[in-house]
Amino acid sequence: MPTFRTLDEADLAGKRVLVRVDLNVPMDEGRVTDDTRIQAILPTIRAITEKGGKAILLSHFGRPKGRDASQSLAPVAAAVGERLGAPVAFAGDCIGSDAEAAVSTLAPGAVLVLENTRFHAGEEKNAADFVQQLAALGDIYVNDAFSAAHRAHASTEGLAHKLPAFAGRSMQKELEALAKALEAPQRPVLAVVGGAKVSSKLELLGNLTAKVDILVIGGGMANTFLAAKGVKVGKSLCEHDLADTARQIIATAASHGCEIVLPVDAVVTKTFAAHADHRVVPVDQVAEDEMILDAGPATVALVREKLKGAKTVVWNGPFGAFELPPFDAATVAVAKAVAEATKAGALLSVAGGGDTVAALNHAGAAGDFSYVSTAGGAFLEWLEGKQLPGVEALRR
């Protein structure tokens, strides 16, 4: 039984349901260019309207300093209506007379988008008076924005203390997937952590060494670990000043019985460009004028071998400069191996973080992972073992 209330438990008929969603979508000249986040909230909207509830959507958009017409949610509301295949009304404010008038005219089953919550300073301050004004517009609160759950703002956290609070379908799916991956996982758990810098993932690495059985480190951050072990990495991206930190992480992992897997070979080049001349070498044979841009085939084979025994995989960050072919090979090969094992029922696989989602989509593997989180910052904070205010506020 989940530790939070879901829409299945809510009496929604005729109720004004304030739904915190994430409509902070990419736009170009008034058109939505990626509707992933809109698609994610449709099941929640439908669950509310089918039960006769009035769905009133709250979201931020961008980082406006006060009211800014260029950051209005009006064009996004139109896009929600198109994807929903139903009329979606829009109110020019999220509090005050405009919002009150729009809410008062809603019939059961109707959908309304309120204007950008960040047009008001009270949103990010989680100001009591702003929370109260929002709460006055609803009878029930639903949070369906895991991607904003790491922020203790009025619409993500404050409202949950003022109205009966429930998790939306997308939030529920995310929390259930994450619980299976790290809170009560099937072991062994293998984590893949890649990306450019160790400095941006220190807390994450520290938390994972205590929770997983095998930690595979790739990307630019692997160079820092290799250098800390005395390997010369040439001109590769490397945080030499973090050598002590890397050694500390290796020691912590050993004390927890967590095996760290580093690249054993590398794809090196002298030029940071797609299709640059390159060669594959063991990691201890990188020339002074070369840089590592990907893990090599022996590393891929090693990771595939480790995957055979794993029951759960958590992935954050690519293995190499995946946006520059052919330096995408390791990321693509390992992603496909995880996807195949998941499809065969051998693995539960959870991945997240902006670059990670892009890398898995590039590999054509995202669809076969058990769960791919589009949450970015909230997913990272969860991996770091932090409590997320928006989630904590939903707990029973």
Curated annotation (Swiss-Prot):
Catalytic activity: (2R)-3-phosphoglycerate + ATP = (2R)-3-phospho-glyceroyl phosphate + ADP
Annotated positions binding substrate: D22, L23, N24, R37, H60, F61, G62, R63, R118, R151
TM helices/strands, residue ranges: none
Molecular-function GO term, any one: ADP binding
EC numbers for this chain: 2.7.2.3
Alphabetized Pfam families for the sequence: PGK
Functional pathway: Carbohydrate degradation; glycolysis; pyruvate from D-glyceraldehyde 3-phosphate: step 2/5
GO BP term, pick one: gluconeogenesis
Stored InterPro entries: Phosphoglycerate_kinase, Phosphoglycerate_kinase_CS, Phosphoglycerate_kinase_N, Phosphoglycerate_kinase_sf
Cell inner membrane is among the record's keywords: no
Top EC class of this enzyme: transferase
Binding of ATP, residues: K201, E323, G353, G354, D355, T356
Keyword Transferase attributed: yes
Location(s) in or outside the cell: Cytoplasm
One Gene Ontology cellular component annotation held by this UniProt entry: cytosol
Keywords linked to the UniProt accession: ATP-binding, Cytoplasm, Glycolysis, Kinase, Nucleotide-binding, Transferase
Family (UniProt): Belongs to the phosphoglycerate kinase family.
Subunit structure: Monomer.
Name of this protein: Phosphoglycerate kinase
Annotated organism of origin: Azorhizobium caulinodans (strain ATCC 43989 / DSM 5975 / JCM 20966 / LMG 6465 / NBRC 14845 / NCIMB 13405 / ORS 571)
Lineage: Bacteria, Pseudomonadati, Pseudomonadota, Alphaproteobacteria, Hyphomicrobiales
